[in-house]
Amino acid sequence: MSRSTKKAPFVHEGLFKKIEEMNGNGEKKVVKTWSRSSTIFPQFIGHTIAVHDGRKHVPVYVSEDMVGHKLGEFVLTRTYKGHDDKTSKR
């Protein structure tokens, strides 16, 4: 289910302000955030955002294809180690 058309896309205010400030200064620093639910805006293109996965911050380089998606979509929170083979138990 998508977000209502009456509502604007969500982005954390602090994150947006940091990106806008860096765009004004021409800087490219890594920005740490815990806001996995923030929508990626076109202003974020070219920046690296460190998104929290529950135990560490994972750097995500934002490209044009990511605009409109959420930051949390690009960072996995669970590790899958696979199932054991039945032959290994014997």
From Swiss-Prot:
Name it: Small ribosomal subunit protein uS19
User: Which BP terms in the Gene Ontology apply to this protein?
Assistant: ribosomal small subunit assembly; translation
GO-annotated molecular function: rRNA binding; structural constituent of ribosome
> One GO term of the cellular component aspect?
cytoplasm
Instruction: Spell out the Pfam families in the cross-references.
Output: Ribosomal_S19 (PF00203)
Name the PANTHER family on file. RIBOSOMAL PROTEIN S19P FAMILY MEMBER, SMALL RIBOSOMAL SUBUNIT PROTEIN US19M
Q: Which residues form a coiled coil?
A: none
> Keywords of this protein's UniProt record, alphabetized?
Ribonucleoprotein, Ribosomal protein, RNA-binding, rRNA-binding
Protein function:
Protein S19 forms a complex with S13 that binds strongly to the 16S ribosomal RNA.
This chain's source organism reads Clostridium beijerinckii (strain ATCC 51743 / NCIMB 8052) (Clostridium acetobutylicum)
